[in-house]
Amino acid sequence: MVLLETNRLRLQTIDIPLLDAASKQDHQAIKELGYETNGEWPNSDFFEAIPYFREILVKNNGTKGFDSWIIVKKDNYEIVGGTGFLGDPDENGMIEIGFATNKSHRRKGYCVEAAQKLINWALSRETVSRITARCEHDNLGSQKTLEKLGFILNHKSAEYKHWIYVTK
């Protein structure tokens, strides 16, 4: 497990037991693993990606940090969302970041706080030189988050707006 902390949040990579509980949407099992949940996590996007995250964890015999992370409030261990990367850096050192906050925890700065910490962690790795992101054209919340983080719009495709992180 890889663990990062901010003032309010704890970010940690997802392990197989938590992934198993999430795949069954077993909120009691999630609580037994030490987390609080109001039932919003895992969301549908994360739920659909569980087979992919499991494959990465099995292939790597655990985590390298370039996979899925949960965002947890430090004061009560409630899972407020998730962030992470869509796999290891490519041969050019590029990785793609993603993030989501549970509906009841949006507009509280959790996503910016967590993603910034994760970006800093990734850029401290020798294998990472560039971070990208994408979001749907109508997802204004994610677009504002990306702008706050320092991403700039790189190009648009039929489905997504594609962003690139500009180091400060």
From Swiss-Prot:
Domain N-acetyltransferase: 14-168
Cysteines paired by S-S bonds: none
Broad EC category: transferase
UniProt keyword list: Acyltransferase, Transferase
E.C. number: 2.3.1.-
InterPro entries: Acyl_CoA_acyltransferase, GNAT_dom, N-acetyltransferase
Keyword Coiled coil in annotation: no
GO molecular function, one term: acyltransferase activity, transferring groups other than amino-acyl groups
Name of the protein in its database record: Uncharacterized N-acetyltransferase YjdG
